[in-house]
Amino acid sequence: MATGNEIAATLHELVDRDFTFMHICGTHEAAIARTGLRSLLPERLKIVMGPGCPVCITPQGEIDAALDLADKDCIVTTYGDLLRVPGSKGSLESSGGDVRVVQGVHKAVEIARKTGKEVVFISVGFETTAPTVAATILTKPPENFSILSCHRIVPPAMKWLLEQGEAKLDGFMLPGHVCTVTGYEDYEQFPVPQVVAGFEPDDILLGLLMLVRQVREGTHRVDNAYPRAVTREGNVKAKKVMYEVFESCDVEWRGFPVIPGSGLRLKKEFEQYDAQKKFSIVFRHISKHSACICDRVLRGIAQPSDCRLFSKICHPRTPVGPCMVSHEGACKIWHMYQTKKSDMPLP
């Protein structure tokens, strides 16, 4: 197999026009920034981050709903990344309620078994985390347990991006983690070059090379540069469990309008575990902070350093937008490495 430097050299030979590809995975962005991979790429080849951070795309209205639950004297449980994401009324960290960080939904269920209080798990994530939540629901947790489903599905967001065309994309690098569960069959509907890529620098470079070759050939398909972990069908059992418990629904993404079929909600037979129904919670649209450009970063039409708040008013200790909170957020990643083109060598 060719080394990273050899693949980069081939890219320099083949890239004879402007290419812009989008990845939809915060782990890809972290790997690219950490290794300085962009410094190996031709000037005319750009790789931009899209809505690949599940915490970042959770809209303020859903954060406000979680805050409402904390005000209702519920024990609110969630992943650590979500604690500092600002809603319109503050964050879970500053709410003053009983908010607990857990490693997963099973830990939230354990808490529910040991208390008489209502326990709500704020359930965020793409198709990677939803099957585990679904499997937990199937175990029939105690009656004082429920989830606030903030799950999202990737393909409908890609469809929206392609239809809008504002990012002027030549292709997509598909999220490796998501595709281990879903496979890539659903992505074959899109008439654009795509590749599933892993997370090592060589994986990402190989994915870019495959995308460039598709564009030069004037064709489109889904190539798999990550066959050691991803198959076309994905994890059939995990998908079956997920759709046994959840059904798709229309939801808003932060930085996006309501995208049809892009969310997951509990089916009617499991609604006793649906915190929205249990506590009459309504997700409201909240206008964004006027100076924050997280919305543009998530749509691939701006980069973190374009924001006048970046690493000044907005930094991990005092985040203005969610992209500076999550370890998968582009702004936090760029803040950590503080460069557009790192001079760090490729491993």
Residue ranges and their predicted role:
Residues M1-G116, A130, K140-P142, L148, ...:
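Metallocofactor- and cofactor-centric catalytic cores in central/energy metabolism, strongly enriched
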Residues R34-T35, G90, V133-A135, E185, ...:
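Short amphipathic alpha-helical segments
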Residues C56, I122, F126, Q194-P201, ...:
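Hydrophobic alpha-helical scaffolding
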Residues E62-A65, R113-V119, W160-E166, Y187-E188, ...:
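Short, surface-exposed amphipathic charged segments that create phosphate/polyanion-binding patches used
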Residues L148, G165-V230:
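A conserved active-site cap/scaffold subdomain adjacent to cofactor or substrate pockets
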Residues L206-R296:
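Internal helical hairpin/lid segments
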